[in-house]
Design a protein with these regions (language model features):
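Short, extreme N-terminal leader segments that mark the start of a protein/domain
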Residues: 1-24
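C-terminal accessory helical subdomains adjacent to catalytic cores in phosphodiester-
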Residues: 13-16, 26-35, 41, 51-256
């Protein structure tokens, strides 16, 4: 996605793995009083601490001294709802309340950050039972509490058994293996454009029951998507409409 849609000469992009779920983020934000902060400084300090706690990840954030060194912040997390058990003391309502608070807080990438949610998990990026464009994608739902079993479901039901249809390979040095054939590059980019379009349309369907590209992007804001997922899918029948956040990010980032 970076190679295909962003400035490939830009060396100022920072990608950091949080290494936990969205509810852990909420807990850490409470501990660091991030919710009471007026800018992104507290969040960056939190991420720095998490980075130091996971030495296997990059330490690139340690080089930052001030929050104003970062112009935009995007956060991507899975919905990842869980039934209460010995390992999770939060009720379903409490988990939903925390997600809603996070979506309200992270609503501007140029301020404190912009949060995007994958439903139910990031693996939804390849949940297509038919080749693109999958005309049935609008109606795909899964149990809201599917948890890690969704990965197995994607492997079993998706017509794409890997990410090759939208991704380049990686060599031993973790560098992109850019195809030599321009047609292959164009095919991957075209697939991304299709994936973006059908996720935009599905987000619109979730929010207003119209499988079409909305005239206003605000209609399919992350807050509206979440509220309608609960009202139309989770609360009535314990299901969630499959939707991926990365195509929606592309849509909003380019304003088209």
């Amino acid at each position: 996605m970076d190679y295909l849609f962003f400035n490939r000469q830009d060396e100022n992009e920072i990608i950091v793995s949080y290494c936990s779920n969205i509810y852990s983020l909420y807990q850490k934000m409470t501990e660091y009083d991030v919710f009471g902060a007026s800018d992104s400084f507290a969040l960056i300090q939190l991420l720095k601490e998490e980075e130091r706690a996971h030495p296997e990840t990059t330490n690139i954030l340690q080089e930052l001294s001030f929050s104003d060194e970062i112009s935009e912040i995007y956060l991507f997390f899975d919905y990842d709802i869980k039934q209460p058990d010995a390992y999770n003391s939060l009720t379903i309502k409490e988990q939903h309340t925390r997600i809603k608070e996070l979506l309200c807080y992270f609503n501007d990438e140029t301020d404190k950050g912009k949060l995007y949610i994958n439903y139910p998990m990031v693996e939804s990026i390849r949940y297509f039972k038919n080749s693109l464009p999958d005309n049935d994608y609008k109606d795909y739902t899964v149990k809201a509490f599917i948890d890690g079993a969704f990965k197995a479901l994607v492997n079993a039901e998706s017509c794409y058994k890997n990410l090759d249809f939208i991704c380049f390979g990686i060599n031993k040095s973790s560098d992109l293996k850019i195809p030599k054939d321009p047609k292959k590059i164009q095919s991957i980019q075209d697939n991304w454009i299709t994936v973006k379009e059908i996720n935009i349309k599905k987000a619109h369907f979730i929010c207003v029951d119209s499988y079409s590209v909305p005239q206003e992007k605000s209609v399919i804001s992350q807050q509206h998507i979440f509220d309608n997922q609960l009202d139309k899918y989770v609360n009535p029948n314990g299901r969630i409409a499959i939707l991926n956040a990365f195509p929606l990010f592309l849509y909003e980032y380019y304003r088209v």
